[in-house]
Regions:
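A short beta-strand-to-loop micro-motif at the C-terminal edge of the catalytic HATPase_c
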Residues: 157-171
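Hydrophobic core positions in the C-terminal catalytic ATP-binding module
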Residues: 102, 170-178
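Two-component histidine phosphotransfer core
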Residues: 1-159
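Two-component histidine kinase transmitter core
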Residues: 179-184
């Protein structure tokens, strides 16, 4: 309400409202161990909108959920999409010349879903993350969360993999497999 009374341009008002929305959702989601796929993807969309101006006009982001998947009913670890998306933008796409592409794709597998985050940025260089204003904290938290959850689930486990794209492509691909039957109780 107070933002609408702000005497800035419409773009500034919009960005400020998106920032407030992002911060509010960030606080909500980081307090939870699991969230619906829909909530996580909505959060990621807000983050992408905030970063769009900084990354540049030649930034294209797509989020696709395969037909037949009910994103409101599928539970996933909180931040499991947001952290790879943030890393792709910060470390792969920001400052890159030319077209910048970020794709999030959610597909069905036999007993779960696969979430793939792909960019056409610089590629994944673990030793460079800390040198490019990153601390690696997001990935460390993600790995520890997955490890903890996997120890509590005796059958199917979450699988998380980061690779550099091949076949002459540049960029990084993060692939996450999440079983449908998975407990988030610790």
């Amino acid at each position: 309400r107070e933002i609408n009374q702000f005497n800035g341009s419409e773009e500034v008002k919009h960005n400020l409202m998106e920032l407030v929305k992002y911060l509010r959702r960030s606080l909500e989601l980081t307090e939870k161990l699991s969230v619906s796929l829909q909530d996580e993807l909505d959060f990621v969309r807000t983050y992408i909108e905030l970063e769009r101006g900084r990354v540049g006009e030649d930034f294209v982001a797509t989020i696709t959920v395969e037909d037949g998947l009910d994103a409101t009913r599928i539970m996933i670890p909180s931040m499991i999409v947001q952290i790879p998306v943030e890393n792709a933008i910060k470390h792969g796409l920001a400052g890159k010349d030319g077209k910048k592409e970020l794709m999030v794709y959610v597909s069905r597998e036999t007993n779960g879903i696969r979430i793939t985050v792909t960019d056409n940025g610089r590629g994944y260089l673990p030793q460079v993350v800390s040198a490019t204003r990153g601390t690696g904290t997001g990935l460390k938290v993600l790995y520890k969360t997955i490890q903890l959850l996997n120890t509590k689930n005796k059958s199917d486990k979450i699988r998380f993999n980061i690779t550099n794209r091949s076949d002459g492509q540049t960029g990084t691909e993060v692939s996450v497999y999440i079983p449908f039957r998975f407990s988030y109780d610790l």
